[in-house]
């Protein structure tokens, strides 16, 4: 590597709003404040909700379906 052209790589602290503190290496140069992390994000904790409640086709079929009709 060439000397003097790369940014300084140092250890910084990333603090999440849930209280989790992570020490990482970065070129940012200052401590980071995070909104979500792997400890509190709904995808990783398993507390996610299914937001897809059907699309336009499902709504159309529900509105115009005939009760007792064959599919």
Curated annotation (Swiss-Prot):
Q: Does the keyword Calcium apply?
A: no
Instruction: Fetch the PROSITE patterns from UniProt.
Output: RIBOSOMAL_L31
Any idea which positions bind Zn(2+)? 16, 18, 37, 40
Q: Name one GO biological process term.
A: translation
| Cofactor annotation remark | Binds 1 zinc ion per subunit.
GO CC terms: ribonucleoprotein complex; ribosome
Keyword annotations of the record? Metal-binding, Ribonucleoprotein, Ribosomal protein, RNA-binding, rRNA-binding, Zinc
Q: Which cofactor does it need?
A: Zn(2+)
* Gene3D superfamilies linked: Ribosomal protein L31 (4.10.830.30)
Which residue pairs form cystines in this protein? none
Tell me which InterPro entries the record gives: Ribosomal_bL28/bL31-like_sf, Ribosomal_bL31, Ribosomal_bL31_A, Ribosomal_bL31_sf
State one molecular function term (GO): structural constituent of ribosome
Q: In the UniProt record, does the keyword Metal-binding occur?
A: yes
Kindly name one Pfam family recorded for this protein.
Answer: Ribosomal_L31
**Family in the record:** Belongs to the bacterial ribosomal protein bL31 family. Type A subfamily.
Subunit record text: Part of the 50S ribosomal subunit.
The protein's job, in short, is: Binds the 23S rRNA.
> What's the name of the protein?
Large ribosomal subunit protein bL31
Q: Which organism is it from?
A: Yersinia pestis
> Gene name on record?
rpmE
């Amino acid at each position: 590597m060439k000397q003097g052209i790369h940014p300084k790589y140092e250890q910084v602290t990333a603090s999440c709003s849930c209280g989790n503190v992570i020490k990482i290496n970065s070129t940012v140069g200052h401590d980071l404040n995070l909104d979500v992390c792997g400890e509190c994000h709904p995808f990783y904790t398993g507390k996610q909700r299914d937001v897809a409640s059907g699309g336009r086709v499902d709504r159309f079929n529900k509105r115009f379906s005939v009760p007792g009709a064959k599919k």
